[in-house]
């Protein structure tokens, strides 16, 4: 088993597909840091604090998992400072791989000691994307099969807030 990996993402929200990739990573690495990106270029439904709370709640019973936030700077620098030997990325489709492959090459250039590990989720999650979950949930659709009950509650709360405004 390898040492430590980081699993970065926006996780807006954290889905069962994300959880599946994390659990697969724990079969390979001794410890995985789930790292939430505070990406100013992405419009998110949940604040980074809300996303942090959701991920922490979902993974609280998983051993050897921690949750952190990357507020600024490069992921490669974060990986170096964290002592990570790998960056875990979930890949559902070919279009995911194209982008992730480019990012892995850049990260390898910036931090040659890190390896990007691409993991495919269970086939039942290949079409589950946070964007779709957000959209369906905000329109009142049932996404309970795709997210943890705590995340479902937070999506319902957001939907109620939006209706109130």
UniProtKB/Swiss-Prot annotation:
Listed cofactors: Mg(2+)
GO BP term, example: coenzyme A biosynthetic process
Binding site for ATP: 10-11, 18, 90-92, 100, 125-131
Main subcellular location: cytoplasm
HAMAP family cross-referenced by the UniProt entry: PPAT_bact
NCBIfam families, sorted: coaD_prev_kdtB (TIGR01510), cyt_tran_rel (TIGR00125)
Official protein name in the record: Phosphopantetheine adenylyltransferase
Source organism of the structure: Chlorobaculum tepidum (strain ATCC 49652 / DSM 12025 / NBRC 103806 / TLS)
